[in-house]
């Protein structure tokens, strides 16, 4: 009897943890190494086109200076959206959520995200991590 109760409790806890993990749909979409010189063609291509409603940016190994970002959607006319991003991200910092797909058409999927910017205050290249929420 005691083992039945233990197994039941374990299953219940596992089910709660499972459902909690599914509720958080945040995924690392990719990481870009940012060069030390200003570059305007840094692209994160998503191998599988996915619906992404918002993104967060974070950095490691140095500070970043960003001058622009755009999202490209898989569509017949290659639609895109310019993102409103912070101009600087310090090492270890994560931005607030940046909304995308805000044009009443939440069915479009993201095929690529491009960035313009460079590493500052570091001899190593900083890494820009892109986190998506669908």
Curated annotation (Swiss-Prot):
The keyword Ion transport does not apply. Disulfide bonds: none annotated. The keyword Signal applies. Residues 1-23 form the signal peptide. Keywords: Signal. NCBIfam families: PRK10154.1. Belongs to the UPF0412 family. This is UPF0412 protein YaaI.
